[in-house]
Amino acid sequence: MLLFNETKKVTRQQGWCLTGPPVEEGEWSIRLLAGTLSGLWYDVQVPGSRSLMLNGTGIITMNWGRGTAYQVKFDALDKHYTAVYPEAGRYDLLIKGEVHLITEFDSLASDSLKGEIKAFRNLTALEVLHLAGSWVTGDIAALPASLLQLSLQETLVHGDLAAIGRFPLLKKIDLTGTLVEGYSGTLLPLWANGIELKFRDLHLSAGDIDELLHDLAATTTENGKLDIGGLNGRRTSNSNLAFTALAARGWTIICVVGHATFGSADISFGDANARFEEEAA
């Protein structure tokens, strides 16, 4: 087997994991391990390096789209993996092997990473996914249910916000500025106390906000934080009881509480920008 932390270039059979003791000729025996992460690529406009931070266990083969690949053995530590792209172009990222043992994937805020988030469907142990600032697309419902932390702010992902109900282990999520289309309502999981939910600038309607507050109040989670400020609707009196119940359980809720346009009677005094005011409960 590979030595601890050892990497080894593989042959043209890219995506194949090499394992077992070396034979007399110095070659490695080959086996195909189940699982693939494909469908992501780097759109390199300015030549230079691109990096990922990964964590997990097991063995994978990484192909950065430059015609070569290398093997990595994880040891449950956060590590950076880097490729240098000397020319502009599209470079497909392919990871094969024991991808079901990857626990963290961080694009390190690269704005040249593109592709569909369904690429992560085989990463069934994935706990932390940071893709903020990238150009990834796709429905958030396609992500694995194992997630603890999810950062997709300012990406092109979409879907019903009710998909958050698919993540029972969630502790922190940020979907700010994405293309998520409303909230249809769902039975939310019993999340751990202290969960952080950030859904700013999603253009949620007043009805969406009210329903989300009702569904959160129906859980027993305490001391959470919900940020639904920015470019979202203003909650109505229909959610007053839910709002009060959450505040009594220690929740901090940041939401739009007043709208104003010049010449409108609906101005909330003290609003510095004459557009909206936010409150924390």
Predicted feature locations:
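N-terminal capping/linker segments that flank leucine-rich repeat
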Residues: 2-136, 140, 145, 161, ...
